[in-house]
Amino acid sequence: MKIRVPATSANLGCGFDSVGFAVNLYLDLEIIGPSERWEIIHDLGAEIPQNDKNLVIATALKIVPELAPHKIRITSNIPLERGLGSSSSALVAGIELACLIADMNLSTQVKLQLACSMEGHPDNVAPAILGGLVISTYHEGTLEYVKLAMPEVGLIAYVPDYKLSTVAMRKVLPQEMLFREAVCASSISNVMIASLLKGDMVKAGRLIEQDRFHEKYRTKLIELEEIREIAHKYGAYATYLSGAGSTIACLAPIENTDKIVEVLSKHSNANVMKLSFESNGVRTFG
């Protein structure tokens, strides 16, 4: 059996911890067979455990503590700790792994609830499970969501050659914000979502770049403004910090994406990728 989970990009505009979409990078997991102990084959680096400390296995064991050990193979082209949902993809793979080995037929809603209870917020795990663009809220243990299709728009990921820990990047955020700022953020997010629904990427782009929650605190470490200026010079609708970074995502007219990729690739040592939106969430094969 095989499991495939897409990468995700989240935190569009003021949709902090709420708005995310799936993209065409993947974590792939193959169940090779039963084993005396958990054994994970991968070439993702020495920092990724190859035993039951691996996030995929640790997640599966949270759901089914007595889950029988297996030998599995993991491959992934999702950049690690770069704001493209690498940890969420591992968590979702772990939920699916538990379901397959224990022969549990959990509903999508139950899987979403499990993922949110572990992750704490739905912006990455929801599109990883559902695919597409997902608008969601997780409050007092209850998840509500709407899955949408993204408008026809090009997507570029500017992936710097340095990692940023989500935990560390959350520590730089304030614990509170002024009421008037919260009202402003709410109204910006409302119109941004409405613009995406109408396919008005010009208006949506303006609003995506009016984040009030995290970018101004996190971009002291990331070259967002510089990349934003370059991208707009070549016709981009919007740039934003994907997740906690370090990836900067760029939305642009499809016909402009190749030029933006070319220009940004010459700018630094970052890995610049032209991506596409993934309508499918986690899938199993075989």
Model-inferred region functions:
Residues L106-E152, T239:
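Alpha/beta catalytic cores of group-transfer enzymes, especially the acyltransferase/condensing modules
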Residues V134, Y138-E144, K163-A194:
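Anionic-ligand binding region
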Residues V5-D17, S76-L100, G120-D123, A238-S246:
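Glycine/serine-rich anion-binding loops at beta->alpha junctions
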Residues L25, L84-S107, I129-V134:
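DPxDG-like acidic metal-binding loop motif
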Residues L196-G286:
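Glycine-rich, charge-dense phosphate/pyrophosphate-binding loop(s)
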Residues P34, P65-K71, A98-L114, E140-E144, ...:
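Phosphate-handling active-site elements
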Residues M1-R82, L100, M104-L106, L275-N280, ...:
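ATP-binding N-lobe of GHMP and related small-molecule kinases
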Residues G33, P160, C250-I254:
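Short beta-strand-to-loop capping motifs
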